[in-house]
From Swiss-Prot:
Disulfide bridge map: C37-C66, C44-C59, C49-C67
Keyword Disulfide bond in record: yes
Organism listed in the record: Rattus norvegicus (Rat)
Assigned keywords, A-Z: Antibiotic, Antimicrobial, Defensin, Disulfide bond, Secreted, Signal
Domain of life: Eukaryota
Name of the protein in question: Beta-defensin 10
Lineage, highest ranks first: Eukaryota, Metazoa, Chordata, Craniata, Vertebrata
Length: 71
């Protein structure tokens, strides 16, 4: 019984926290959003897009706006 409880405790401790791999996957998603914005000749802006630009999407971290010049 002690062995079973010990194995269960070890298993819970191993899977109870975010591993570094999960952090890396979040970073990849952030990079993909930013690269998507720059691919369409946009730029990330902290708040609303400035007047000569338009909102075309979002840059993932902090939900920033992806802005592009109107042409």
């Amino acid at each position: 019984m002690k062995t079973l409880c010990s194995l269960l405790l070890i298993g819970c401790l191993l899977f109870s926290y975010d591993t570094p791999v999960v952090g890396e996957l979040k970073h990849l998603g952030m990079t993909a959003e930013t690269e998507w914005c720059r691919l369409f000749e946009g730029f990330c802006h902290d708040k609303n897009c400035p007047p000569p630009t338009s909102h075309v999407g979002s840059c993932h971290p902090e939900k920033r706006s992806c802005c592009k010049d109107r042409r």
